[in-house]
Amino acid sequence: MDMLIYLAPICALIGLIFAGISYKNVQNEGAGNDLIKKITASIHGGAMVYLNRQYRAIAVFVVFLAIIIALILPNGALTAACFVFGAVLSATAGYAGMLTATIANGRTTNAATRGIGPAFRVSFASGTVMGMSVVGLGLFGLSLSFIILESVYTDLDLLTIVNIVAGFSLGASSIALFARVGGGIFTKAADVGADLVGKVEAGIPEDDPRNPAVIADNVGDNVGDIAGMGADLYESYVGSILATMLLAASTAATTFPNIPVENVILVPLIISAIGILASIVGTFFVRTNKTESSAIHMAFNMGLIAAIILTVIASYFVTSMLLGEYGLNVFFATVAGLVAGFLIGQITEHYTSYDRKPTLRVANSCQTGSATNIITGFAKGMESTLWPVVIISIAIYIAFQLSGLYGIAIAAVGMLATLGISLSVDAYGPVADNAGGIAEMSHQKEEVRQITDTLDAVGNTTAAIGKGFAIGSAALTALALFASYGIAVGLSAIDVMNPNVFIGLTIGAMLPYLFSSMTILAVGNAAGEVVVEVRRQFREIAGLMEGKADPDYGKCIAISTHSALKEMIPPGLLAVIAPLLVGLVLGPGALGGLLAGSVASGFMIAITMSNAGGAWDNAKKYIELGNFGGKGSDAHKAGVTGDTVGDPFKDTAGPAINILIKLMSIVAVVFAPLFM
């Protein structure tokens, strides 16, 4: 173990170096003409101002919670240090992704003047910075924390050391929740405000420079889908590895007799390290010069499949070497997670792509008005829970039968092992979306806009797939953390006949609904302020509609920023306070019930909201292609309404529930000593 464990931070550093190379490649691309540079600078400036203000606000929470951890927990000072370290690295990953995306958008537009190949290369290189930064910083921080604690504090046993390292995961979760909620509120407030007044009331196209909220809308794409998604999956990535290490330290003696505990702890770290290398190799398979969206999809799938195959092959040798006779069982549990993640992505694509039946049915319903569109879309969202639940259930069953609770955790590690490339694919989308907006605002030729539209259309699908993947990985990670909590407090089962446990179960099932309500209302409040401001500018700025005067873009950015930072606090506090209160007042069994209830209901709500929102979005896009009357028709107006309702579903509430269930689970794990 002494030498092999260093493979984790070494591979993590290789991932970070690759991210740095990708950043330089993006930076070396031409930035375009003066107008492209001006628009890019506005988006970049707005995004970085928001991110800096958000991180300053979160820093207050991090410092406060770190002090509490240091004062009340055993080994509190060390746990608090890991907590702060995890938070800082999560913020760093978000900063790197945002910085790159907001310089890559204009460069992608400029590259599109040379063809789809150069534009695709720039946008994907930007996504690679986010993907490799997340896995590199996550694995580096987690493995380094473990190595330092094991080397310096030799009097501590392995279980105690891993429990201290759990603070790192709590830090990641804390940043993730605020980044996801705050980013989701910002992006959808700007998006809804821009669409309602611009498209519906003023009748101007999307990304029209006359719209005062258009820059805020483009800033929001980066805030929500780069920093927010990155923090979400960083949390899942770190949480799955940490949960597996915890279960290894606590159950290895019974699950894997005669195998050194150190070997069992090493497995998730080494599989994740190999996944980074496989993801880097996979990026070299993502190449295309064809203009069809199907060719771009194929390029992405080639990269993902290559990374998965390499990870599967390497995982076989790792598990066989470290776990001996038990290696094959753990290997198949890992594969179960990998396959489940891939299949959930395919199911998500089926329900949200406009060339598949569910979304086509939603688009068709727009012909009879907004109400039937909302009804059909919501029904399809609920229907879409079936197969993800079946897939996750089968993966859990297989993993548990093969390797017990450790198998479930290693399945989550397997699902996230190739996160480096899957997040790179996901983070490409907002860059392509921004590039299309910049092409529109800078009055590029029609063929340039066609290229950016093609890239954007693929980006919409990859974003939907990414959300499905994030939900599935969140469910497995939360379950693994829940198992770790159960072992820590001595829960062998959740006894629903116990009144306290049943109370905890019902509270847990309710929390995702309350949380969703808070975040959706926050979007509504913030969007209302943006709508009022956009209407004011159209009314008061002479010559704005005629294109003779410029709008005040900064005002809408300022409103969205202020609203997001103000509204993200109550949901964030709920996720931390609820498990602590239930655990302290009703006991560890009730808290176990709360975690079980929140995972079960949260998984369903997140899938429903994400897929319903994705279907409404792409149903509108299908109509905009000229179907059912095209743009400006009654069907299109109904489609815009559905898309507007779906925006906070798929980009705010749904994704944030992932973090809610994971954060409550890691809070329970870290503060478990208080409940015993």
Swiss-Prot record:
CC cofactor: Mg(2+)
Keywords: Calcium, Cell membrane, Ion transport, Magnesium, Membrane, Metal-binding, Potassium, Sodium, Sodium transport, Translocase, Transmembrane, Transmembrane helix, Transport
Keyword Repressor: no
Parts of the chain that traverse the membrane: 3-23, 58-78, 83-103, 129-149, 158-178, 241-261, 265-285, 303-323, 327-347, 390-410, 411-431, 469-489, 501-521, 572-592, 593-613, 656-676
Chief localisation class: membrane
Listed InterPro entries: PPase-energised_H-pump
Self-association and partners: Homodimer.
Protein name (database record): Putative K(+)-stimulated pyrophosphate-energized sodium pump
Binding site for substrate: K188, K650
Record-listed E.C. numbers: 7.2.3.1
Membrane in keyword set: yes
Organism: Methanosarcina acetivorans (strain ATCC 35395 / DSM 2834 / JCM 12185 / C2A)
Family: Belongs to the H(+)-translocating pyrophosphatase (TC 3.A.10) family. K(+)-stimulated subfamily.
